[in-house]
Curated annotation (Swiss-Prot):
UniProt-listed PANTHER family: CYTOCHROME C OXIDASE ASSEMBLY PROTEIN COX11, MITOCHONDRIAL-RELATED, CYTOCHROME C OXIDASE ASSEMBLY PROTEIN COX11-RELATED
Membrane topology reported for the UniProt record: Single-pass type II membrane protein
Similarity annotation: Belongs to the COX11/CtaG family.
GO cellular component: plasma membrane
Gene that encodes the chain: ctaG
Protein name in UniProt: Cytochrome c oxidase assembly protein CtaG
InterPro entries attached to this UniProt entry: CtaG/Cox11_dom_sf, Cyt_c_oxidase_assmbl_CtaG
UniProt organism field: Brucella suis (strain ATCC 23445 / NCTC 10510)
Cytoplasmic topological intervals: 1-13
Record localization: Cell inner membrane
Length: 201
């Protein structure tokens, strides 16, 4: 009986060890999954991988004679009652030339709604050379009931585009946006105003 009891205790300890190991592995996998999203986003922004465009603060100093066609695509995710489309379907621009185009959005719902745009470029490798100076995708967007909103994008294609051997046959780039519904943005608290109110009270 004693040997049997010891064996049962060892078995329970072994089972408990396995359970703890499995739980730890599961928790680590969840943590890795959550961490991989922002890390992947940062990687894409730095390298242009997956068609992620680049955000820049200044215009190109060089404009080439070579031109490229840029097409514009618009999509709406489920749950966002907007009509969203480019105001022009395509433009032909000189590489390095700064260009502004506009999308437009219309709220079809009877209440205020909120959207956030994701974006990518095709072919994916071209994303490393597609630079946006201004874009509605940099911030969240709010539309009142029935409101129409023009959404500008200011961009240029980096002149280094022509030096990439993998893109030598590319004549057209497609810039695509998808709007997703989001919760109502939280109001920004004015710390100075709050402090003044407290001091005055």
């Amino acid at each position: 009986m004693t040997d049997q009891g010891e064996n049962e205790k060892k078995q329970r300890r072994s089972n408990a060890t396995i359970a703890v190991a499995c739980l730890s592995f599961f928790v680590c996998m969840i943590g890795a999954a959550y961490a991989s999203v922002p890390l992947y986003r940062i990687f894409c922004q730095v390298t242009g991988y997956g068609g992620t465009t680049q955000r820049v603060e200044q215009y190109s100093d060089t404009i080439l004679d070579k031109t490229i066609k840029v097409r514009f695509d618009a999509n709406i995710a489920n749950g966002l009652p907007w009509d969203f489309k480019p105001m022009q379907r395509e433009v032909t621009v000189r590489i390095g030339e700064t260009t502004m185009i506009k999308y437009e959005a219309h709220n079809l719902f009877g209440e205020e709604t909120y959207g956030r745009a994701s974006f990518n470029v095709a072919p994916g490798r071209a994303g490393a050379y597609f630079n946006k100076v201004e874009c509605f995708c940099f911030t969240d967007n709010t539309l009142k009931p029935g409101e129409d909103l023009e959404l500008p994008v200011v961009f240029f294609v980096d002149p280094e585009f022509v030096n990439d051997p993998d893109l030598k046959d590319v004549k057209t780039i497609t810039l695509s946006y998808t709007f997703f519904p989001i919760d109502k943005p939280k109001p920004v608290v004015n710390a100075k105003a709050v402090g003044s109110t407290r001091n005055g009270g």
